[in-house]
Amino acid sequence: MSESPAPGAQHSARGGMSRGEIALLSAVALAELVTRVLYILHHRADSDEPQHLHVAWGWTQGLIQYRDLFDNHAPLFHMVMAPFVGAFGAHASAIVFARWLMLPLAGLATAATYFLGRRLWSRRVGCWAAACIGAVPSFVRVSTEFRADDLWMVGWLFSLLALLGGDLTARGAWLGGLLLGATLATSLKTVLMILALALAAALTLALRPRERWRLVPNRGWRLLGRVLAATAVVPAVIVLVFWRLHSLTALVNCTVRHNLVPGLGLWRSQPYRWLIFPLALSILVPCTRRYLAARTDSGARERRAAFVLTAAIYLALLEGFWPLITAQDFLPSTPMLVLLAVAMVPWGLARIERWLGRSVSPRWGTAVAATAAVIGLNGVNLAEASWRDANQAETQLLTAVLRFTHPDEPIVDLKGETIFRFRPCYLVLEGVTKARLAMGLLADRLPRDVARTRTHFAVPDDGAFPPAVRDFLNDHFVQIGALRVLGADLSRHARNGPDARAFDVIYPERFSVIADGAPARGTLDGVRYRGPRWLLPGYHDYRPGPGERSVDVIWEGAVSRGLVPAATAMSSAAIGSPAAARPARPARIGSRS
């Protein structure tokens, strides 16, 4: 960089790291790598992971995102991951496999943090910032998961590296713009980041001392033009691709119109949050002016100021205006904040040095950073023990799905938890969809879609289902192992006369009645039950036989596949169901999920 070292640079000499410090860094990095590998294997599946996997899998089946599969995320991540998902195939360990794909992205984010620290401050700051981000609990958890935010983070950090990592050149402007465009094609939250970066650059230019107050010379305008032109390249290619696939309108509907809901989330519950933004600016502007005034001819100092302002303004915009805030929204800003925290250590040592009037060993800075990393790693394992397998539920669900269901059979789920099966309805039940249902902006079509598609399976009960949907599923599906099957648990249904239990059938189908793990012996609709029976839509009643307690009405096809709600083993023949299930058929291309 063009200027002399910043205060405290004697504590962070670029090539002055001792062997002991390098060994300590290596030990921290190794511990973080082991923790991350254990998280890949054991971390509880987040509902976003199978949703992203389902969309990527859809591309491998010849389905078009948005047109055939609903998704309210930008498409680049799913398009990039689709070949890997297709190569792996349908396996119960799909989540773990997908997380391994995130490991290189985490490595790239770490490398970008290092290079940003090295170019803006020093090699030591870059090294310890890269080490410390792997010890932030929320960062480790979210960046381990298979989600578009990982690619989003990498694109954003390398965009900053190209634009702020040194004196901006024509090549850097083109590269930075291309990366910004790819980031925008990965997540529409990049709009906040681009706005933050633009405001940060404008404030940095405006707050420079008067002797450097040539606002934007001709070269600066040319560089800005290159950045803007390059930023448009990847989004333009995405638009062209989806236009050719006759899915451009669906893309706009799913990613823009669907997500714009008046009064959504914090917009309704905290309407004065927008005040966070002007309050943040009232603090940032004088602090930046004072920082830039300390040295009147320092390009590196201006780049640092722009970096700090970008991080702060992004957080202010997010907290002030974004309606639904999640942990992953902070993923790209976490390395920036950690980098700033590490950079404050040599600055603090320089202050202490001036106060004491004598030199302070840079080892104190190393000790502070290493201690923070160790405490952070402990926090990672306190938040969720990396050695304890919390991912069994999703694996068991996928095992049951692949074992008991056929590729062309739809399954009711929230957001795509079954990954390799379609939903009976188009929309997924994520936060915005549920808000639209609650506001009456969307009609609840699930019961009609279940009947229309003759859906026989659903995922287990989950409090994330909207109340009406949850009640419908509990009334018409029975939990058997890791899946729910079309039917009714008569122990929770209203009685229809003395000892009779009523249940509802939503479309014509053959049902078996199982009592305490064996064929029932009571009467169904007034006729003695002797085997599977074809039932028409509407209400029916069953009167238990002598001694029958736990009674379930179950779709007969599930019984033939071995899905029986009892510990007592029971053959298909004993229940009177067909000998074998039909062979699996490939999913129909173009069907809606």
Where are these regions (language model features)?
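Hydrophobic/aromatic-rich transmembrane helices and adjacent perimembrane loops
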Residues: 142, 149, 192-193, 316, ...
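Extracytoplasmic
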Residues: 189-190, 245, 374-500, 518-539
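Transmembrane-lumen/periplasm boundary regions of multi-pass, lipid-linked membrane glycan transferases
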Residues: 209, 219-300, 313-328
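Membrane-interface transmembrane helices that cradle and orient dolichyl/undecaprenyl
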Residues: 124, 157-175, 207-209, 286-301, ...
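Specific aromatic-rich, kink-prone transmembrane helix
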Residues: 132, 151-168, 175-180, 198-206, ...
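Loop-to-helix entry region of an early transmembrane alpha helix in multi-pass inner-membrane enzymes
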Residues: 75, 79, 89-108, 142, ...
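Transmembrane-helix motifs of polytopic, lipid-linked glycan transferases
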Residues: 26, 30, 100-120, 135, ...
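Membrane-interface alpha helices of multi-pass inner-membrane proteins
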Residues: 129, 142, 162, 172-188, ...
